[in-house]
Each structure stands twice: as C-alpha cells, then as structure tokens.
C-alpha cells in the first residue's frame, strides 16, 4: 500500500500524528488506550504493536496486562483471554530480546 499510494499513506500517517497530539495524553497513555481499542476490534497484530509501543513509552508489563483485563466486561472472558495471550506473547518476546 505504502509503495503504491505514497501520498495517501503520508496523509494517513499525518492524521495519526495529529490525533496523537490533539490532546493532553502522553505516549504511554495513548499506547495503552490504543491497546484497548485494538483488543476491542480483535486485531491481534495491532494488540502486539501497541503492546510494544506501550513498553517503549515506559509502561510496565503489569500496566499493559491491566489494560487487557479491563476489557473483560465489554468483550467477555474468552476474548479478553485471547487478547491477554497476545500481550503475553509480546512481553515474552520483549524479555527474550533483552538478553
């Protein structure tokens, strides 16, 4: 997509930047919120991505897991557990990458 439609992709990227800076949330809060949004949409790749971004922004593993736990009453237990497993995969990989 990026190679075929570079102008459209650039506009999309700019929209994301503008949305991120339009209010008072910091990078960690944004990443945790986006993790929850990705969980609600059941987008596994996005959960992994926003989990990594949350770590990079200074979120602890406990904070990221808590963000997923909050989805239980909205998504239901099975969906929350699936999202939590995606988070745990990402956290495990991040921990292995440290060594």
Spell out what each predicted region is:
Residues 65-90:
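C-terminal structural segments of small proteins and small subunits
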